[in-house]
UniProtKB/Swiss-Prot annotation:
Topological type in the membrane: Multi-pass membrane protein
Gene Ontology, cellular component aspect: plasma membrane
Alphabetical UniProt keywords: Cell inner membrane, Cell membrane, Chaperone, Disulfide bond, Electron transport, Membrane, Oxidoreductase, Redox-active center, Transmembrane, Transmembrane helix, Transport
Organism from which the protein derives: Colwellia psychrerythraea (strain 34H / ATCC BAA-681)
Protein's recorded name: Disulfide bond formation protein B
Gene that encodes it: dsbB
Length: 172
């Protein structure tokens, strides 16, 4: 119990989080530029969520001794993991209902006007694919289904670490 509570005050777990997210970002770029799979708008949003998790890991690794840095890292990790899970679940639902008349997939990301990431970093955030298209499977799971697993794991680990940290911090 105490180990989990103190895990975020050391650098290694934060580096592991950053490396896991970096691996996922690099995998996304591999799928896009080597295998030729065009990312859809939901893929772009999921990339942004992974980028938030990567940022959490990097900030936590650099500032693991600083409470403000750790709080910022927790916030980015939680937001990235939970928002990513929600987006991935929506993406799976879109793929399930892609033949429906009510199915719609935007082509321009809904980023704030002050941060048009798809214009600033198009190689990473430009959506050129169709959300309903399933062009890749692994063990009969589509990419969004695998991302549900990934984000669920990130969310579960986040919840366990955060709850443990809060419970142990309250003990005298």
């Amino acid at each position: 119990m105490n180990y989990l509570s103190n895990i975020t005050t050391s650098q290694r777990p934060w580096l592991l989080l950053a490396l896991a997210a970096l691996g996922l970002e690099l995998s996304a770029l591999y799928f896009q530029y080597v295998l030729g799979l065009a990312p859809c708008i939901m893929c772009v949003y999921q990339r942004l969520a992974i980028l938030a998790i990567f940022s959490a890991g990097a900030i936590g690794a650099i500032g693991h001794q600083n409470i403000v840095a750790r709080i910022l890292a927790y916030v980015l990790w939680g937001v990235g993991a939970i928002w990513g899970l929600i987006i991935a679940l929506e993406h799976v639902e879109m793929q399930k209902n892609s033949g429906s008349l009510f199915f719609s997939c935007e082509f321009i990301p809904n980023f704030p006007t002050w941060a048009p990431l798809h214009e600033w970093i198009p190689f990473l955030f430009e959506a050129t694919g169709d959300c309903g298209e399933i062009s890749w499977r692994f063990f009969n799971y589509s990419m969004p289904q695998w991302m549900v697993v990934v984000y669920a794991l990130f969310s579960i680990v986040f919840s366990i670490v955060l709850i443990n940290r809060l419970v142990c911090a309250k003990k005298p």
